Amino acid sequence: MKQWWFIILLIISFPLKADNIFVEAESFDCRGGWVLDNQSMGQMGSPYLLAHGLGVPVENASTVIRVENGGKYRVWVRTRDWVKQWDQTASPGRFELLLNGKALEVTFGTERAEWHWQDGGTICLKTGENRVELRDLTGFDGRCDAIFFTSALEMLPPDGKEELTVFRRNMLGLPENPEDAGEFDLVVVG
């Protein structure tokens, strides 16, 4: 009898595993008119996509995510409002996130000057392939670092650099230390 209580206690104590999908914006299949910007890698540990259209909205960036368990997910988009540091009220770097052709109700790039996870609300993802797009609204430097979908609706991804690095590594299944490829005098990339 005591064994059953112990098993029940274990089941109640550990929440069910959430379904998480972490998408680096720079890994989109098609960048459209968005460009890869790596100027903040020292601060963030990752490059991001930038919609630099000189006032003309750029072509959508797009990718496909594969969802094992369809259902309700919360969406988080890592972004920033680059003019908030000057106390500006307008947010020129606004963009939308489209899922399977439908824009979320939230406009991104409108909240804070520093990089952060902006809440996109809850959505329903279907099992299988789902198309994700970034739609620039202004052509004035919208910024997207990553998108995080989670079935743990109350979960907030970390913002601190060290915590985010560990989180990103875990979500992408990367090792803690890079594989040692040996010593070389010259490396040619490209």
Residue map of PLM features:
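Extracytoplasmic
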Residues: A18-G173
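Sec-dependent signal peptide recognition
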Residues: K2-I8
